[in-house]
Amino acid sequence: KARQLKTSILRKLGRKEEALALVAESLQIDRFNMGCRFEHYLLTRDVKVLEEMKELMRGWAHGYIEYALDFAAAGLYEEALSLLECHVTGTTEIYPVVYYAMGYFHTCKGDESKALEYYQRAEKENHSYCFPNRIEEVLILQDALRLNIHGAKAAYSLGNFWYANRQYDNAIACWEHSAAINPAYPTVWRNLSLAYYNKRDDKQKALETLEKAYALDEHDSRILMELDQLYKRLGRPHSERLAFLEAHLPEVEQRDDLSIERITLYNQSGRYAEAKELIAARNFHPWEGGEGKITGQYVLCRVELAKIALSEKRYADALVLLDETDACPFNL
């Protein structure tokens, strides 16, 4: 970072040869000093230099943001913008913080109308995996909210930052603000539900917001899983939970955890033969934290069916069922 800054200063002073020498020396030490590589391009305007830098950067938005922040920290907003523009050019799906950062750099330059334009662009990008984690991004997103009163996604993203950093009241305030601007975004309601339940012990609000999230996107199998888990924690009757899951079978069948919950509910309802059939019909994939869940249901349904067989004096059937509990089949 210091070498990039010194190179920038030399370039600004018109001492091009010294700047180029420092770039060469710096790249001998660290070939991945992208700040110096970009300075090399600014000094020479050699497209090959730029293309080599872009190849090494692999289109990784976070790398571009990091080096752009280095330039911006020195007041080199034009250079920061130019670097991010290199990433944007030719990229089809832009990580939203790239546009938010470009907007903020325009604010720092005193051009708030241009800043607003970039903030509005950022709102249109996919925020599914937008999780800001730099302290500078707080200032960036706060400025986006200041200039763009319709910035629902900026509020949502800032809430993600606050929640990850245990500032739960700030996170909830941001998500509530986001939901007020755009009540049609399911993920913000889902996030609010988790915060209400886990951080405020407000079970009613948690239920209302998660049901709203699922109503907005009934094809989201993850939200379905979380809603069923909430129903479970709140003591929803087995019959209601099972009916709810079976009303959304395509989504249930996308996930092992939901499929296991359905099987468990069959066993808990005494429908052991149906549970046994469902277990045999699916290939399960154990996950961390889920060890033993499906194998437990596999054993349970057979033991209970064996008890029924014994009560009906079908001793051979009972022995077959109990023998099957000695080892689990490969589909589990």
How would you name each of these model-derived features?
Residues 8, 42, 69, 104, ...:
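Residue-level recognition of tetratricopeptide repeat
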Residues 31, 58-59, 92-93, 127, ...:
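Short coil turns that delineate tetratricopeptide repeat
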Residues 19, 80, 115, 137, ...:
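Single-residue signature of alpha-solenoid repeat helices
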Residues 11, 72, 107, 163, ...:
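Position-specific recognition of the canonical hydrophobic site in helix A of tetratricopeptide repeat
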Residues 24-28, 55, 86-90, 123-124, ...:
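Conserved structural position within tetratricopeptide repeats
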